[in-house]
Amino acid sequence: LLAHLAKLCVRSIGQPDAGLWEIRNGWQEHSFTNLMSWAGLERLERIKQAGHLGSISLDLTHARIHAAEALLRGVQGGALRNGPTDSSDDAALSQLPILGYPNRQLCESTVLRITHELSLRRGSEDTGFFYRYVRSDDFGKPEGAFVICSFWIAQALARLGRTSEARTILDRVLVAANHVGLFSEHFIPATNT
């Protein structure tokens, strides 16, 4: 099973797809797909090095490096963007430090860009909520925050040692919980809905 998953990771590197957000009319090479391929291959490489993965015909080190090279094609202006041909920002890429990508400078510049560019503000005030992206999709431009993005960004900031900023985001996002502590997918801070 793990060998099969490794082959699927390799097959996905650099290939057009609908991306994490399943954009119907936006098939392209996505940095998030390359990041997930890198993460899967990096974990499989560690599993093999620990002696818990039998014979596998794939050179996992070479495959991981190939995924990292593909990922770096999406870097523009020092931060990872949606893809090599798409300079838009994507909050899912805040998972770079969460997944342990080894380039701290790239992790930090990407997360800080996302927090700046995708923050849902009320006037000039940050609300602690973030758009998953601000580009148009099959339904137009996003109007509300995508709640999981706040948690990703808080975790990423904490991984980068920016715990005060992470806590502020978490404190602000708690208003989105319903009466039993559950969060919806979308949230509009202006109306608390």
Locations of regions flagged by a protein language model:
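Extended glycan-interaction surfaces of carbohydrate-active proteins
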Residues: A3-W21, T61-V147, T168-T193
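The feature captures the catalytic groove of carbohydrate-active enzymes
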Residues: L1-H66
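Well-ordered alpha-helical scaffold segments within catalytic/enzyme domains
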Residues: L1, M36-L53, Q95-Q105, F151-E165
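Short alpha-helical patches at coil-to-helix transitions and adjacent helical residues
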Residues: H30-W38, D90-L93, V147-S150
